[in-house]
From Swiss-Prot:
Alphabetical list of NCBIfam families matching this protein: cinA_nterm (TIGR00200), molyb_syn (TIGR00177), PncC_domain (TIGR00199)
Record-given protein name: CinA-like protein
SMART domains membership: MoCF_biosynth (SM00852)
Family that this chain belongs to: Belongs to the CinA family.
Pfam family, one: CinA
InterPro entries assigned to the protein according to its UniProt record, in alphabetical order: CinA, CinA-like_C, CinA_C, Competence-induced_CinA, MoaB/Mog-like_dom_sf, MoaB/Mog_dom
SUPFAM superfamilies the UniProt entry points to: CinA-like (SSF142433), Molybdenum cofactor biosynthesis proteins (SSF53218)
Length: 408
């Protein structure tokens, strides 16, 4: 089955808006064993839209088109699909009634331009939209079918889940089995090299392997087609987990902050944070997780040396002897946070995020991290590359990963 994506809108081509819909759908289709063959971006121009619809539907069995479904002058999708088919637009009364009721709830009358959202090419199947005002629609075009959806992400994704993905699954019949593991701080090339014995195994003929690097994560993914796919995918999973061991921090939809919160909650324990160069990023990552209040005791941004001494009890002589960016100070920050918060765990981070402040002995990107727990304190040193934001974010995620490992 050949699938293409056609994303429309001037805003996507001027850089005002980043298309997040297409990567999301590509990932969901990959779970079904399908790789999108092409993605096309096209402006709100009638000639360009008609040409793009003709081109994509001549190649693909399914074209998922987004944008241009609203009430304004530059919303042209229904009009252009109808022009390609050589059919008129027709008013869809059930959609008109839904729009009237929606506007009534907001105390407004339905205006003529909003009625535009309920006009579709003759013969189209209308896809109701529970998340917004503009329905989607689908109609046969060319060698296959085009599905036209609003571009608002929550609406696009909802309609994909309700119509596009079930339609694709029904066309495919037996859905392939897929697996995904997430590695922490493993370069993509290293992951590929380590996976060679699995990929070259004749038992895995026909399996599609893929990698995605999004520092500090690298994702290893596999899709297994055909009979016995689930059992084959499970065997691959066991081999992958054996290869990477503790470098695997999660699978599927797992996210590192959520895993850390879940592990702390399962143990009935809390953590306290003593951050310097990260400026509260670790606390931000944790508090973004629902339920974090049950496991996060306190977060201190002790940026100045005086604050390190006064708030977290870092000894002045330690700072004088080793400097703020050092392993002893990272340990003292972790232990001070743990002590101050009365928590089971403490995390300490200190470093030079740049762009200035580095020395030959401690260049920009030098970061010391520590985790203090019931059995003592573990510390690591890292030399990160990148700009100030990248260094700080790497350090924040590294701190969470160290805590994850300590909680195993």
């Amino acid at each position: 089955m050949q699938v293409e994506i056609l994303a429309t809108g001037d805003e996507l081509l001027t850089g005002q808006v980043v298309d997040t819909n297409s990567p999301w759908l590509m990932d969901r289709l990959w779970d079904l064993g399908l790789m999108v063959r092409r993605k096309t971006l096209v402006a709100d121009d009638r000639d360009d839209l008609r040409a793009s619809i003709l081109e994509t539907t001549a190649r693909a069995d399914l074209v998922v088109m987004s944008g241009g479904m609203g009430p304004t002058e530059d919303d042209l999708t229904s009009e252009c699909v109808a022009a390609v088919l050589g059919v008129p637009l027709e008013r869809h009364e059930p959609s008109i009634e839904v729009l009237r009721e929606r506007f009534r709830k907001f105390g407004r009358a339905l205006t003529p331009n909003n009625e535009k959202q309920a006009w579709f090419p003759r013969g189209a199947e209308v896809i109701p939209n529970r998340w917004g005002s503009a329905p989607g629609f689908t109609v046969p075009v060319g060698r296959g079918r085009v599905v036209c959806l609003p571009g608002v992400p929550v609406e696009y994704r909802g309609l994909c889940e309700e119509w596009v993905l079930p339609h694709v699954g029904a066309r495919l019949g037996e859905v392939p089995a897929a697996g995904l593991v997430k590695l922490f701080a493993v370069p993509e090339s290293h992951a590929d090299h380590a996976m060679r014995p699995v990929m070259d195994d004749p038992a895995n003929a026909g399996v599609r392997f893929g990698y995605r690097a999004h520092w500090p994560e690298t994702h290893v993914k596999w899709t297994v087609p055909g009979p016995g796919a689930a059992a084959r995918a499970a065997r691959i999973r066991e081999r992958v987990l054996g290869i990477f061991g503790e470098q695997v921090f999660g699978e599927g939809k797992d996210e590192l902050p959520e895993l850390v919160v879940a592990r702390l909650a399962a143990r009935g324990e809390r953590v306290a944070l003593g951050e310097s160069c990260t400026g509260g990023m670790v606390a931000e990552l944790l508090t973004a997780v629902p339920g974090a209040s049950a496991v996060l005791d306190l977060g201190v941004v002790a940026y100045a040396n005086a604050a390190k001494e006064r708030v977290l009890g870092v000894p002045a002589e330690l700072l004088a002897a080793h400097g703020a960016v050092s392993e002893p100070v990272a340990r003292a920050l972790a232990e001070g946070a743990r002590r101050t918060g009365g928590a089971a765990w403490g995390v300490g981070i200190t470093g030079i995020a740049g762009p200035s402040g580095g020395t030959p002995e401690k260049p920009v990107g030098t970061v010391h991290l520590a985790v203090a727990g019931p059995s003592g304190t573990e510390a690591v040193a890292r030399a990160y590359r990148g700009d100030r934001d990248r260094v700080r974010r790497q350090a924040a995620y590294e701190a969470l990963n160290l805590l994850r490992l300590a909680l195993r």
